[in-house]
Curated annotation (Swiss-Prot):
Family: Belongs to the AG-peptide AGP family.
Entry comment on modification after translation: O-glycosylated on hydroxyprolines; noncontiguous hydroxylproline residues are glycosylated with arabinogalactan.
Leader sequence residues: 1-30
Protein name from the UniProt record: Arabinogalactan peptide 1
Taxonomic lineage of the native organism: Eukaryota, Viridiplantae, Streptophyta, Embryophyta, Tracheophyta
GO cellular component, one term: aleurone grain membrane
Propeptide: 41-68
Keywords annotated in UniProt: Glycoprotein, GPI-anchor, Hydroxylation, Lipoprotein, Membrane, Proteoglycan, Signal, Vacuole
Species the sequence originates in: Oryza sativa subsp. japonica (Rice)
Lipid-modified sites (GPI-anchor amidated serine): S40
Membrane protein topology class: Lipid-anchor; GPI-anchor
Alphabetical list of InterPro entries matching this protein: AGP3/12/13/14/21 (IPR039281)
Function: Proteoglycan that seems to be implicated in diverse developmental roles such as differentiation, cell-cell recognition, embryogenesis and programmed cell death.
Length: 68
């Protein structure tokens, strides 16, 4: 029982690290990138960041479910 609890805590911690790391990578790449031209493509780039974070969280949750 204690082993299962420990593995679930580790899985949640790994998921949190993935979310924080993806957030930091997104912030760093946005800061390094040149400002986008004011076109319709700029909104597509802005919408991709939350989608990437959602996919990261979903992948971490699936990994936690499969391996715990």
């Amino acid at each position: 029982m204690a082993g299962q609890l420990k593995s679930k805590i580790v899985a949640v911690a790994v998921a949190a690290v993935v979310v924080v790391a993806s957030s930091l990578v997104g912030t760093a790449s946005a800061a390094d990138a040149p400002a986008p031209a004011p076109t319709s493509g700029a909104t597509a780039t802005a919408a991709a960041a939350p989608a990437f974070a959602a996919v990261s969280v979903a992948a971490a949750a699936l990994g936690g479910y499969l391996f715990c």
